[in-house]
């Protein structure tokens, strides 16, 4: 079913910005609002890095997201559409970032109403990576979750950036 959804997204003829937002979400598995509000100034596309500042993160901690080559390519495709604006996923018609409902509505148009949500990428990624035996610390770091072990959370400031690139 997941493969069918990914194929449907690739073939969808919707707005380029909304389509790009749908396409990039499975690669970064950040919170929907975080990816939707991605700023050009947060990106280092040559290094494949996206840095979210602490003030916009749910947990109040800056978050570095490694970008795979596919994610970088998707972002670069948007430069002609939104490169002159602050936000990558810009709604030209309304002169603001894409709305919270943009991807949800797109998923509904694709026939996935009630079957999949924009936040679902995080659940799917976590499940698939755990099933494949990836280290839980790396997965939780990618999801920007605080460590449930308070002592480890206090002392361990590792980002596992290279491991998360896998």
State each model region's role.
Residues 26, 32, 39-40, 47, ...:
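Active-site proximal loops enriched in glycine and acidic residues that flank catalytic Cys/His/Asp
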Residues 52-60, 72, 95, 143-166:
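Catalytic-site neighborhood detector that most strongly recognizes the C-terminal catalytic loop/helix
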Residues 14-18, 67, 71, 99, ...:
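Hydrophobic (often cysteine-bearing) scaffold residues that line and stabilize catalytic clefts
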Residues 42-49, 113-115, 134-156:
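Short, polar N-cap/turn motifs at the start of nucleic acid-interacting alpha helices
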Residues 23, 27-34, 98, 102, ...:
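C-terminal catalytic core of tyrosine-transesterase DNA break-rejoin enzymes
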Residues 1-38, 46, 57-61, 81-82, ...:
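Basic, Lys/Arg- and aromatic-enriched nucleic-acid-binding interface segment
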Residues 7-10, 26-29, 40, 55, ...:
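Hydrophobic alpha-helix feature that most strongly marks membrane-spanning transmembrane helices
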Residues 1-4, 47, 66-115, 137, ...:
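Active-site/catalytic core of tyrosine-dependent DNA strand-transfer enzymes
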């Amino acid at each position: 079913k997941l493969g069918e959804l990914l194929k449907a997204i690739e073939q969808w003829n919707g707005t380029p910005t909304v389509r790009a937002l749908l396409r990039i979400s499975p690669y970064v598995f950040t919170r929907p609002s975080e990816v939707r509000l991605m700023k050009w100034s947060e990106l280092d596309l040559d290094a494949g890095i996206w840095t979210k500042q602490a003030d916009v993160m749910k947990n109040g901690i800056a978050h570095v997201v490694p970008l795979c080559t596919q994610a970088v390519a998707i972002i670069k495709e948007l430069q002609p559409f939104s490169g002159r604006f602050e936000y990558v996923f810009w709604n030209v018609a309304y002169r603001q970032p894409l709305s919270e409902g943009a991807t949800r509505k797109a998923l509904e148009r694709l026939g996935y109403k009630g079957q999949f949500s924009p936040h679902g990428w995080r659940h799917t990624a976590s499940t698939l990576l755990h099933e494949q035996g990836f280290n839980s610390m790396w997965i939780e770091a990618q999801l920007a979750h605080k460590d449930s072990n308070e002592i480890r959370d206090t002392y361990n400031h590792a980002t596992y950036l290279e491991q998360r690139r896998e």
